[in-house]
Structure formats: structure tokens, C-alpha cells
A protein has these predicted regions:
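N-terminal mitochondrial targeting presequence
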Residues: 1-42, 589-590
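Beta1/beta-strand and adjacent pyrophosphate-binding region of the FAD-binding site
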Residues: 38-54, 74
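N-terminal FAD cofactor-binding segment of flavoenzymes
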Residues: 61, 85-136
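FAD/FMN-dependent oxidoreductases across multiple families
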Residues: 310-468
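C-terminal helical "tail/cap" subdomain of flavin- and related membrane-associated enzymes
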Residues: 393, 455-590
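Conserved N-terminal helical subregion
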Residues: 121-234, 239-251
């Protein structure tokens, strides 16, 4: 069970006590290098640093809320927001950076009036999810119907989430902000320095920009990513580590799957997310349209760089194989791929296809089996093989220039609120935390931060409080810190548990996955508290889930080897957090 001992000491202090009276001696700040008299200084109630999805959503939330809309707000972004506002892909082309927005997140965006500016022809409802073990093939399936057995505050949604390109969301938010009078957007403007007004504790921060303008703010909000200047100014430390894992992303193309075709029960529309946990990292295929999907393949840095350097057709062959072939076959394919790369003779599509075909023969995969992918021409014609709905559609092409990669990391700020000479600052989104993408919750975490912060500031205004004071911001910290910590720890644990092929661990995690897949109450709780249901989730969800668990004698003992507290994991990890100690959930009712 997650407890306060998992958090940094300063976070525990913030969550349990009043604000500290003196600044921490370890925090240091640069001295002012320029004369303020040479620059104009303008006062704002709120200054937001960062114009990504989180920063724009925060600006929209503040600018459209009935209470906070009276605040004078500025948003500073280093890049050009004009490019985002005018973004337009060619027909059939898609950005390689996409997000899965939970129904809760969509509801928040809708509440700001921004969703009507999102191009809904470029969004895809996520109607189901298939997650399975790359060694044992133990599987769990999620769909909105799993919510039907649980108490909710509203109707069961038709979809679990909405897939959309990040740029589509950003453009919609920008268009909404065009009609919000009290929010000023300052793009192509870099933050040169952040200083205290007169260098005093609790004084207003002053942001000096590359354009020569200075902005003094009652509250400075960092929505400025992992390398947050606001966090550095506030002297807030962040703990974490880099994973020995990189993510490869790309836009994939598939044959059309007509759900109204003859033998429709064998055909499926492209509205299911697929994720397979390989020992080198999870691979996910996320639907965009009936014929396009987004790839997120987390693997070792060496394999990632080799896949990116390979011909796109070779990468497509490896993607199909990674979802279908046994672990031993994949390890052999990796060796062949790396060997060819080291010899500076990248593996050709023809050679890659031949190797996959040999692997299929070696592991008794028949030519028209759902697990086959070598003879792609015959597999994409006629009636699909039985079991095709359990696997993503075959990749027949990759969008030009869509292949990219980036390192993965875990981080969590020790607090979200600045104190002392770093006072009147608060962090949201990636400035406060970064998470492994296997849970698909990074942006949703940030939007949850923003929703709580807007509510917190609205309450401060309603009670006549100073919106930049520690006490006014503390409810936001208390609402979000432990929630985010739960998700971060559970996701990190999943990454580690599925990164081994040790037989006892494989057996334990596979047994747990199969047990939970048979319990709709548990699956519904996983989805409900992850935001699949826009209604509030209360203790009744846990009671329903625990009731289902108690009928399963010995399940807690079976899963204890995996460790962790399922209730904490479920609470914030969402549909991918399917491992943990079921016994902890049983005990939570006692």
C-alpha cells in the first residue's frame, strides 16, 4: 500500500503541515545581471511559462472559468504558436506525436469551449484495449462494457478514450484562446532570467524575456517541461532516473478493415489499442483512423537506434513480427538486425521477410495463421484468419519522415509549490513529473493537475485569498501529489516486472493478468478511476471490485509474488495497471 513514506520529506511536510517559515538554505539564485530600469515591467496576476498542450489548456481553463476569467494572464512560449495555429497535414498524413485523452480529460477540454475547435475528423474513439504478456501470452481485454457492472454517476460511455494528435489539440486550444480577452500569448519569446522583486521572500517573481520585456506576476506557473526554468528558479529538486530504454514512434498504415463486410464477425474496425509487453519493453499500436495507427515501441537504446536507421519497409516487418512471434524468435531477429547494422549493411526488407518466414516455420506458425506476417499479400486479402481481432492490423507501410525516437525517464518534483525566495510558483505537467509512456497517461496527468489548479485558484479568489500564497496553493498540492506518485510508482513497477523473463515472475504476472481478465468488476474499476468514465469514482467502486475479488479463494497468495498494492496502482495507473497485490484490495475493506 502506497504511503507518505514513498514521498520526499519536503512533500510529506507540505501534505501534512502548514507552510515552512523560512527558506531552505540550500536554495540559491543568480543575481540580477541587467538594470531593470532599461526594461518595461508589466504586472500580471498569472504568468504561465510553456505553450505546449498543458500550458495552453491551463490558459484556456483560467480564461474561461467563471471565477478565474477575471485574472490577467500571460503565457510565454519560446517557439512560434503561429505554426501550431496554422498546422495542417496533407490528407491521409498524421503527426507522430499523439495522445490518448481519457473521457475525464475530454470533459475538461469541453468545459473550456476548446473541443469545438478540435478537428474531430482527426480523432479516433478508443473502443477497446488488448494487453498481453510477450512470453506467456496471458491477456487482458478492456471495453466500456466492463463499466456496466459498477456504480457510476452517469451513462456508460461509448469509448474508453479519444486518440488525437497533440497538434490537433493544441490548435483547438489556440483557436479558443483567440476569443479570450484576459489571456495574452507571447510566442517566439524566450525566458532569459527569473528574479525576485527586490530579492525578498514571498515577493512577486519577475520574468525577463528575450524581447526585452519583463513580466511581474502574482503567481508564476511552470508548464515548461522536464527542464523547467520555473522549477529551477523555485529551487525545487526533482528525483528520478533515465530508463535504459528509448521509444520509437511512427505513423503506420494498414489495409482497410470493413466491419460491415461479409463474415463481419471475423473483421474488426481499427478502434482497438494493442499493447504487448516484450522483455525489451512494451510495443503499442494506437488507432488513428480505419487505415492508420500510431506506434510507440519502447526498447533498448541500441535496438531503437537500429530500428530507426533501418529501411522503413524493414521496420514495418519487425513491427508485425514483434506483435506476433514468440520471444525467442524475436531475440534471434534482433541479433540478425544488429549484426547487419554493425556491418554497415542495413537489413533489407527482402532479407527481413525471409528471416521472419524462417522463424514462422521454426515455431509452427502456419501461413494463414493470425500470428503470421511474412506473406503479407495473402494475409491482407479475403477473410481474415481466426484470432485476427486479438492482434493489430498488419502494417503495410510507414508514413515518410514519421519515424523518430526519444529517451524515456522517470522524474517527480519534491514539491509542486515554491517557498522562501522561490515563493509564488507552482508546477504542472511534465515540469512536475514525467512517466513511462506504457500507461499512456502523461498528458492526462497534466490535465488533471490543471483541472485541480484552476479549481484551487477559483476557491482562493472566492474566499478573498492571495492566489500566490502557499496556503492558497496547498489544496492543489494535496489533491495531486499522492495521486501522481501512485501512478509513477505503479508504472515504474510494471516496467520492471515485465522487463524480465524469469520463470517465477512470468508465472505470477501471467496468473494475475488472467485472473483479473475474468473479473469485470476489477476491470471496470481500473477503467473508471483512470478516467474512462467521466463520472466521479467513489468508494463504491472499490466495494464492487473487492466483492468480486473475495469470491476468488487464494488469489491474493497467488499474486503476492508480484508485490505492490493494487488499490494504489488501480487508482492512478489506469487500464495498464493490471498487476499488483490483490490481497491489498481485499484488506482495504476490513
Amino acid at each position: 500500500m502506497l504511503s507518505l513514506r514513498h514521498c520526499p520529506k519536503s512533500a510529506r511536510s507540505a501534505l501534512c503541515s502548514r507552510p515552512p517559515g523560512v527558506p531552505k538554505p540550500r536554495i540559491s539564485y543568480p543575481s540580477l545581471q541587467r538594470s531593470l530600469s532599461t526594461q518595461s515591467t508589466e504586472d500580471y496576476d498569472v504568468v504561465i511559462i510553456g505553450g505546449g498542450p498543458a500550458g495552453l489548456a491551463l490558459a484556456a481553463g483560467l480564461g474561461t472559468n467563471a471565477i478565474t476569467s477575471r485574472l490577467k494572464v500571460a503565457l510565454i512560449e519560446a517557439s512560434s504558436l503561429g505554426k501550431v495555429r496554422n498546422w495542417m497535414e496533407a490528407p491521409g498524413q498524421y503527426s507522430n506525436r499523439v495522445s490518448s485523452l481519457t473521457n475525464e480529460s475530454v470533459a475538461f477540454i469541453q468545459s473550456t469551449g476548446s473541443w469545438e475547435y478540435v478537428d474531430t475528423s482527426r480523432v479516433c474513439p478508443l473502443e477497446a484495449m488488448q494487453v498481453w504478456d510477450g512470453i506467456s501470452d496471458a491477456r487482458i481485454h478492456f471495453s466500456p462494457s466492463d463499466l456496466a457492472r459498477l456504480p457510476t454517476t452517469g451513462a456508460i460511455p461509448d469509448s474508453m478514450a479519444i486518440m488525437t494528435e497533440n497538434l490537433n489539440l493544441q490548435r483547438g486550444l489556440l483557436k479558443r484562446l483567440d476569443s479570450v480577452p484576459n489571456v495574452k500569448l507571447l510566442d517566439t519569446t524566450k525566458v532569459e532570467d527569473i528574479q525576485n522583486d527586490a530579492g525578498e521572500n514571498n515577493s512577486w517573481p519577475i520574468v525577463h524575456t528575450s524581447t526585452g520585456q519583463s513580466l511581474r506576476s502574482r503567481l508564476l506557473i511552470g508548464a515548461d517541461g522536464f527542464n523547467s526554468p520555473v522549477r529551477k528558479f523555485a529551487g525545487i529538486e526533482s528525483s528520478g532516473w533515465a530508463y535504459d530504454t528509448h521509444a520509437v514512434v511512427a505513423t503506420l498504415f494498414h489495409p482497410y478493415r470493413d466491419k460491415h463486410a461479409t463474415l463481419a464477425h471475423l473483421e474488426q474496425p481499427n478502434s482497438t489499442a494493442f499493447q504487448r509487453f516484450l522483455t525489451t519493453g512494451p510495443i503499442a499500436c494506437l488507432p488513428l483512423t480505419s487505415t492508420a495507427s500510431s506506434l510507440v515501441w519502447s526498447t533498448t537504446p541500441l535496438i531503437a537506434s537500429t530500428l530507426k536507421a533501418a529501411p522503413p519497409a524493414t521496420l514495418a516487418i519487425f513491427i508485425n513480427a514483434a506483435f506476433r512471434l514468440p520471444n525467442a524468435a524475436l531475440q534471434n531477429l534482433y541479433s540478425i538486425l544488429l549484426s547487419a547494422h554493425q556491418k554497415e549493411t542495413p537489413l533489407s526488407p527482402e532479407a527481413a521477410r525471409a528471416e521472419v518466414q524462417q522463424a514462422e516455420i521454426a515455431y509452427s506458425v502456419l501461413p494463414h495463421d493470425a500470428r503470421a506476417s511474412a506473406d503479407i499479400d495473402s494475409l491482407t486479402k479475403g477473410v481474415l484468419p481466426e484470432g485476427s481481432n486479438l492482434l493489430p492490423p498488419l502494417v503495410i507501410g510507414i508514413q515518410d519522415k514519421s519515424i523518430a525516437g526519444f529517451p524515456l525517464k522517470y522524474s517527480h518534483a519534491e514539491t509542486y509549490i515554491g517557498t522562501g525566495r522561490g515563493a509564488r510558483t507552482v508546477l504542472v505537467g511534465d515540469a512536475a513529473h514525467t512517466v513511462h509512456p506504457l500507461a499512456g497517461q502523461g498528458l492526462n496527468m497534466g490535465l488533471s493537475d490543471i483541472r485541480e489548479l484552476v479549481a484551487c485558484l477559483g476557491n482562493a479568489i472566492s474566499t478573498g485569498s492571495d492566489i500566490g500564497s502557499y496556503t492558497a496553493l496547498l489544496p492543489y498540492m494535496r489533491a495531486r501529489y499522492m495521486s501522481n506518485q501512485s501512478l509513477l510508482l505503479a508504472t515504474d513497477s510494471l516496467h520492471k516486472v515485465y522487463g524480465t523473463d524469469a520463470a517465477p515472475i512470468v508465472w505470477a504476472r501471467s496468473t494475475g493478468l488472467e485472473i483479473i481478465n475474468e473479473l469485470s468488476a476489477i476491470k471496470g474499476a481500473l477503467m473508471g478511476v483512470a478516467g474512462a468514465s467521466p463520472g466521479n469514482v467513489g468508494t463504491s467502486w472499490w466495494n464492487a471490485a473487492a466483492t468480486g475479488i473475495e469470491g476468488l479463494a487464494g488469489a491474493g497468495d497467488v499474486l503476492r509474488a508480484v508485490g505492490g498494492g493494487l488499490k494504489d496502482a488501480i487508482t492512478k495507473t489506469g487500464s495498464n495497471i493490471v498487476q499488483g497485490g490483490v490481497n491489498a484490495l481485499k484488506n482495504s475493506r476490513r
